[in-house]
Structures are given as C-alpha cells and as structure tokens.
Regions:
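Acidic, surface-exposed loops and disordered segments
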Residues: 1-259
Length: 259
C-alpha cells in the first residue's frame, strides 16, 4: 500500500475522549471550518453550531461542534429568487445528510493534520428538542451529529476494521458465505479483545429479560456488541420520526396533495 503523511494520518485516526488544557486558537478553528466548507456538494446543506464551554461539552472538550442539516438557509435563498421548495422532506434530508457528513469528515481530517483529535457523538438527532431550545434552531434544521475536538491527552490505538474483501466489491455485490463472514468476525473480535476495548470502557450493552447473560469482558467483543445494539435498540420508528418532525421534517410519505 502506498503512503504519505495524509494517508498515515487517516490510517492512524482514532476517537479521542481525553483532551489537554490547551485551547485551539481562533485561527485553528477557522481553518478547520473552512476545510469543512470545501466538502461536496454545491447546495451546501451543512452548517455548524460551536460550543467552547468545557463544563458543558462532552468529555470536557474545548470544542463541541453540532453539525446541522440546514435546509432553512437554502429555503431563505430560494425565496429571494421567488422559488418554493418542491423536493420532499425525505429527499432533501437525504441530500442534506450527505452534505453535512462530508463537511464533518473534512473537519476531522483537517483537525488531525493540525494535531487535534476528535470524537463523533451520534445521538444528536434524538436530542433535537433540547438542542433546538438551547440554540434557537429554526424549522427545517436537523442536528445530525456532534463532534468533540481538541488537543489529545491520550493516545489510544486505531480501532480494528473489516478485511478489505468484506468492504471493496468490484462490479457486483458478493454472496457472503459463512466462511467470509466468520473470517471478518474473527478479525474484528480479536482486534477489540487485543485492545481490551470494552473492559477499559467498562461497558456491555445490557440484555433484555428474554436473554441470559453468558459473556464476560474476557470474551465480549465487537460482534456481540453490535448484535446487542442493533438487535435491541430503536425498535419503534417514532423514536426517530418524532425528532425529525420536531425539526419540521415530515418523512411519513404524506404529500401536501394528500393532506
């Protein structure tokens, strides 16, 4: 595999949850945000909230960005040209999520190049009501993800990733046989156990009453963790649809003509 400083930084990227007392300068923050702005696409459906309050920010981070899907701003611009949005909420959200996600990842890469670390927090959509109240977000703005950032006070190893054959498919999606899946599971579980990841985190996803706990931190690893998360969480679609509606987005499939 080829290598250069950018590739090395990307391959060594890991989540940072402990930060030094050094605060990033305004110039550093502006540089990171400008790099985020250069991400695709042309509609620029991403914007940012920034908190510098360490006492309130997750992990005591000096910077907490809330990455927004910002359809409101586009609608204001369209209105000045005497246009109303015809795209459905579901469609515009799909494109907005892409814009905002690319923006956030550009920021992470820029931050890494400047010696900062970061950690994504995926629960922002489910905290939409609180974020709206605290930050005065208008309708048609969705908190997509939060991003802590600052100078690292820890050096954890990069987390394991799937083998390339389970990620890169040329021309056609493969039929994933048991051997292919088992090999990938073995790689992921061995990698996380070698790092003692879940023991150090002190966390195992609790089981529902219908299942008996048989794992300890000696054998609890990534595949069991993912199974428990996505086999138990968010069963009711209202858990996501309600926050979206609170942000002014109706993705129920009902059109204005149906109302």
């Amino acid at each position: 595999m080829q290598s250069n400083p950018v590739i090395e930084a990307l391959l060594q990227r890991k989540s940072i949850r402990q930060y030094s007392e050094q605060d990033p300068s305004d110039e550093v923050v502006e540089t990171i945000v400008r790099c985020g702005q250069q991400a695709p696409f042309a509609a620029q459906l991403g914007s940012l909230l920034l908190s510098r309050d360490r006492k309130k920010n997750a992990f005591g981070a000096p910077l907490l960005f809330t990455v927004l899907v910002d359809v409101h701003r586009l609608e204001r611009i369209m209105a000045r040209r005497d246009w109303d949005r015809s795209a459905s909420d579901a469609a515009i959200l799909l494109f907005g999520v892409q814009d905002a996600a690319y923006m956030a990842e550009n920021m992470v890469i820029a931050a890494e190049s400047l010696g900062l670390g970061s950690c994504f927090l995926g629960g922002a959509p489910f905290q939409a009501e609180r974020i709206i109240e605290q930050s005065g977000l208008p309708s048609h703005v969705l908190p997509l993800v939060q991003l802590t950032m600052g100078y690292p006070a820890e050096t954890p190893p990069p987390r394991p990733r799937f083998p390339l054959p389970l990620t890169l498919f040329e021309d056609r999606y493969p039929e994933m046989d048991a051997e292919m899946i088992d090999q990938a599971m073995a790689v992921m579980d061995a990698g996380y156990l070698a790092q003692d990841y879940y023991r150090r985190a002190g966390f195992m996803v609790p089981l529902g009453e219908e299942r008996e706990e048989t794992f300890t931190f000696d054998d609890y690893s990534w595949t069991e963790h993912m199974g428990r998360k996505w086999g138990q969480w968010l069963r009711n679609p209202r858990e996501l649809l309600d926050p979206l509606k609170h942000c002014g987005f109706d993705v129920s499939g009902q059109t204005k003509a149906d109302e």
